[in-house]
């Protein structure tokens, strides 16, 4: 993965990556990506204004290596591996190469503007200076590769240190997520056990209610013939009384 224009470095040489570039290479829904982006601590996320070739400035979010790891490790893929390894290393190497080249240009400009005599001068006073200057140039040329290697080694050491911190933070995040998952799993197991106990209690209550209903229906069924006979007797007595009253009224 080659360095792109989707990165920037601050004054402390911290690498910041454009979140749009990360989103375009991840297979993640936009809403989930935005929610995950705003869970990153503010010190690992910054907002900048980007003209983008339009007449109105737009807001762009940048994340450092920690924030990029939080975004890409949710969906592991080849892009995540390259982003957290070769992409960061190549951008740091190009960054330090540009810094070294700009420093060499500034040194060459300062030398060209210096008021000392040039080597082409034939004055005898300038010859010793030219010799000392040539010696200093040869020394600077011999020391510049060493200085460049040292800067590269320092950059790689800084990248290694940041990667170690990144892996430690990611491992801590994974540990916290694992603990939260275990807590949620234990809570779900407790709720499931409570549901099982509740269903068992409901089954027992249903059986008791059905048994009592069956007993009550049997008692009602058994008592119905006695009530029928009693009603028949009462009806006969009522008819006899009515007939007696009618006969009494007729004779009178």
UniProtKB/Swiss-Prot annotation:
One of its GO terms (molecular function) is structural molecule activity. It is found in: Virion membrane; Host cytoplasm; Host nucleus. Keywords: Host cytoplasm, Host nucleus, Membrane, Phosphoprotein, Viral envelope protein, Viral occlusion body, Virion. It holds the Pfam family Baculo_PEP_C. Residues 104-150 have a biased composition (Basic residues). Its main location: virion. InterPro entries: Baculo_PEP_C (IPR007601), Baculo_PEP_N (IPR007600). GO terms for cellular component: host cell cytoplasm; host cell nucleus; membrane; viral capsid; viral envelope; viral occlusion body; virion membrane. Residues 104-151 are annotated as: Disordered. The keyword Membrane applies. Signal peptide: none annotated. Phosphorylated. Belongs to the baculoviridae PE family. Major component of the polyhedra envelope. This is Polyhedral envelope-associated phosphoprotein. It comes from Autographa californica nuclear polyhedrosis virus (AcMNPV). The lineage of its organism: Viruses, Viruses incertae sedis, Naldaviricetes, Lefavirales, Baculoviridae.
């Amino acid at each position: 993965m080659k360095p792109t224009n989707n990165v920037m470095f601050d004054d402390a040489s911290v690498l910041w990556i454009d979140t749009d570039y990360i989103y375009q290479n991840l297979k993640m829904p936009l809403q989930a990506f935005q929610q995950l982006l705003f869970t990153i601590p503010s010190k690992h996320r910054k907002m900048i204004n980007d003209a983008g070739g339009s007449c109105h400035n737009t807001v762009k979010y940048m994340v450092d290596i920690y924030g990029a790891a939080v975004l890409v490790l949710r969906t592991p893929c080849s892009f995540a591996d390259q982003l957290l390894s070769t992409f960061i290393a190549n951008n740091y190497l190009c960054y330090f190469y540009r810094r070294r080249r700009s420093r060499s240009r500034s040194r060459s400009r300062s030398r060209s503007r210096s008021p000392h005599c040039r080597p082409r001068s034939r004055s005898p006073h300038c010859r010793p200076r030219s010799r000392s200057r040539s010696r200093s140039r040869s020394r600077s040329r011999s020391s510049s590769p060493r200085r460049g290697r040292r800067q590269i080694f320092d950059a790689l050491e800084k990248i290694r240190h940041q990667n170690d911190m990144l892996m430690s933070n990611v491992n801590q995040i994974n540990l916290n997520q694992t603990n939260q998952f275990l807590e949620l799993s234990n809570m779900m197991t407790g709720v499931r056990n409570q549901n099982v106990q509740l269903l068992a209690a409901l089954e027992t209550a249903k059986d008791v209610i059905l048994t009592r209903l069956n007993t009550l229906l049997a008692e009602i069924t058994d008592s119905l013939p006695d009530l029928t006979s009693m009603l028949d007797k009462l009806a006969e007595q009522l008819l006899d009384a009515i007939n007696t009253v009618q006969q009494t009224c007729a004779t009178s």
